[in-house]
Regions:
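Alpha/beta-hydrolase-fold serine-hydrolase catalytic core, especially in secreted/extracellular enzymes
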Residues: 24-120, 304, 308-481, 485-497, ...
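Generic beta-strand/beta-sheet core signal
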Residues: 126, 141, 169, 239-241, ...
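Bacterial N-terminal signal peptides that target proteins for export
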Residues: 1-11
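Bacterial N-terminal signal peptides
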Residues: 9-20
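Alpha-helix capping and helix-loop boundary segments enriched in small/acidic/polar residues
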Residues: 146-154, 189-190, 205-213, 238-249, ...
Length: 666
């Protein structure tokens, strides 16, 4: 073992502490020479800030002229269209008015329509009475209450009492449109934000999002409104609060039929929100927004020059400073376009939601721009209705009430199956084409070409082996901490077992029984923590348990900046392979990869991309992305989501086409 002795002498010469210690202490398995629990998030946020800075530079230039402003807005719209995905062809709405409830000066129609075949949407139409028809109308897009449109809407009552019809729409996962339910229609998750987040993972794999699907349902709701002769098609608005504010922001830039809008308790800047609070639930993000330099204010700006109102609370968890900065951009935009009076903001001494003062301003704004009426807002009776009387369906949920209803899971499975022949056609184009698309989906511009720098960070001599610690550095990437175990029985034919343990290399090495057999057989062990796990695990309190993902904030930030977390981990694996190719102990030895849990899909992708891997064995990991679509109540899905990947391949396809054997050990 002259090489090992030489390496140890070198370590001492470089001032690296070398000693012989036991294997019981967890600290013994740290390879990074620093410790910072939020290092990975800080690394990701640097990209968020860079992208935001580039966006700021572009918008400041746009403010110089009306032509520049229009060019900026059209650029935003085109980039938005590129990332939002495609929508189905429009079919028959098959709308049914299934009931009517009388209010004071208005009535509420209970309506069901199909936004696409088998997808039933439940809505309430608050229709003013004793008015000359057709009347102006608006969509109300619901916040995140599990009951959705519920038994009543105070804002809709006030609108209707002032001569504006309101169509209140149940979103996917709320009201009568829950998807994760038992046979009786009872929810299986604790709230709408959880259901939205779980469903969104499957949508993302298909190249869409829950936000995009909400847009489609809302678009079809407006289509329904415009089929009615009692609705004025030239005077249409949209508003929403909280999650409804999100839907409104995503909606107004793509539908020119909307003449006035209001966003409540959502408007701020994404950059600041991500830094202060982290990502929100699954319906509030479309992948690659940051990469495409689309900020929340940009979605609102696309409304210009049509009238737009922002409603905020001083004590809302939605950051007010970000809202004020975003509104300043709105003001500048509308001023440049010559219509400064068409944008306004109300900030009140309250928190989250559409309270009474905000409702007054909302209705006043809509009266002004939909009816050319600036008279005082007429008060409305605050009536209460029984939820059971307001249901559109017989059993309270469309998926257990409506013949032929399709759950979102079944819709997505059908879509996946329909694309089977397209995936086969794509995969038949050859490895060069497949690899190029794979790199694109992974968020990589190509295979990493920067040379790695190997830094030794420690060495321990044990009875049966030598233990070496390294951090592997590649420009622009997180360092990869790894531990090399060189058994005394190792020889020139010994294989390298590259072990990727989601629980961390330290946990694995702390149990001698885990690797005793490998030592006896003379196998070389290389254990590493890929970014975001092991030594760079994000503290648990930064991720809300309701999102069912231990690294939700980092996974969502990664998708936002256009660098899915799996793609980053593939780079880490390639860095480890470079280490095996370059280090004097490891050159010429075959590399077998053993991965478990979260690491499984990254190992499969790396094996397809790099022929230096001789075999892969995977345990306790997903075997196909179809699992996420069929059964979305799973943990840690976002760690392995690639936006639109299922248009091109599934994991079994990569296993079949890989140059090395890949097997599941369970």
């Amino acid at each position: 073992m002259r090489k090992i002795i030489g390496f140890r002498t070198l370590c001492v010469g470089l001032g690296i502490w070398v000693g012989t210690v036991g294997v019981s202490a967890q600290g013994e398995f740290k390879a990074l020479p620093w410790s910072q629990s939020t290092a990975y998030n800080s690394y990701l946020m640097r990209d968020v800030h860079r992208q935001f800075a580039d966006r700021q530079s572009a918008i400041q230039q746009a403010f110089a002229s009306p032509a520049g402003m229009q060019e900026y807005l059209e650029g935003c719209r085109e980039r938005y269209k590129q990332i939002v995905g495609t929508f189905p062809e429009k079919g028959n709405l098959n709308a049914q008015v299934v009931g009517k409830v009388q209010g004071t000066g208005y009535h509420i129609e209970k309506i069901i329509f199909e936004s696409k075949p088998g997808r039933y949407v439940t809505v309430h139409l608050y229709m003013p009475e004793n008015m000359t028809v057709p009347v102006p109308a608006t969509l109300e897009l619901c916040g995140h209450g599990l009951n959705g449109k519920g038994s009543s809407s105070h804002a809709a009552m006030l609108m209707a009492s002032n001569g504006i019809a309101v169509l209140v729409v149940d979103p996917i996962g709320q009201g009568e449109r829950l998807q994760l339910i038992d046979r009786e229609g009872k929810p299986l998750t604790r709230g709408a934000t959880t259901e939205h987040t779980l469903l969104n993972a499957g949508f993302n794999l298909l190249g869409t999002s829950l936000a995009a699907q909400e847009y489609w349902d809302n678009h079809r709701a407006l289509d329904y409104l415009l089929t009615r002769k009692d609705i004025d098609p030239e005077h249409i608005g949209v508003y929403g609060s909280s999650g409804g504010g999100t839907q409104t922001a995503y909606y107004i830039g793509l539908d020119p039929r909307v003449k006035v809008a209001a966003i409540c308790s959502f408007f701020s800047t994404r950059e600041r929100t991500m830094e202060l609070q982290g990502p929100s639930d699954g319906c509030q993000h479309i992948p690659y927004e940051g990469r495409e330099q689309l900020e929340v204010p940009d979605f609102a700006l696309m409304m210009a020059p049509r009238p737009l109102l922002i409603l905020s609370g001083k004590y809302d968890f939605v950051d007010l400073w970000g809202a004020q900065q975003g509104f300043a951009e709105l003001q500048q935009c509308y001023k440049v376009l010559g219509v400064p009076e068409k944008v306004d903001m109300l900030t009140v001494e309250t928190g989250h939601g559409l309270g009474a003062e905000k409702r007054q301003k909302l209705v006043s704004w809509f009266k002004r721009w939909l009816k050319d009426d600036q008279s005082p807002v007429k008060k409305a009776e605050q009536e209460r209705f029984q939820l059971s009387d307001m249901l559109c369906t017989t059993k309270g949920q469309v998926n257990v009430s409506m013949p032929g209803a399709l759950s979102i899971m079944q819709e997505n499975v059908n879509q996946l199956d329909e694309w089977a022949s397209k995936r086969e056609a794509f995969l038949s184009k050859g490895k060069k084409t497949v690899q190029a698309k794979m790199l694109d989906l992974l968020g990589l511009k190509g295979l990493p070409d920067h040379k790695i720098r190997i830094e030794a960070t420690g060495h321990d001599s044990m009875r049966e082996y030598e233990q070496y610690k390294f951090q592997l550095i590649r420009e622009g990437e997180m360092p990869v901490p790894c531990i090399l175990i060189m058994p005394s029985r190792a020889n020139a034919d010994s294989p390298i077992e590259l072990r990727l343990q989601e629980e961390g290399k330290g946990t694995y090495l702390s149990e001698y029984a885990n690797f005793a057999a490998a030592l006896t057989e003379g196998k070389i062990l290389l254990l590493a923590d890929l970014r975001g796990l092991g030594e760079t695990t994000d503290p648990a309190f930064y991720t809300d348990a309701k999102y069912w993902n231990r690294e939700y904030r980092n996974a969502m930030v990664s998708m936002h900046i256009g660098r899915p977390i799996m793609g980053q981990r593939v780079v880490d694996i390639l860095t480890l392979l470079d280490f095996c190719s370059e280090h004097e102990f490891l050159k010429g030895h075959s590399v077998k990869v053993f991965a478990n849990g979260i690491y499984g899909p990254a190992a499969i992708h790396a094996a397809y991309l790099d022929e230096r891997i001789s075999s892969v064995e995977i345990k306790h990991s997903m075997k196909t992305w179809k699992e996420y679509i069929e059964r979305p109540m799973q943990w840690d899905m976002y760690s392995n989501v690639l936006y639109g990947a299922l248009k091109y391949y599934d994991l079994p396809d990569l296993i079949r086409l890989s140059n090395c054997p890949i097997r599941f050990a369970d």
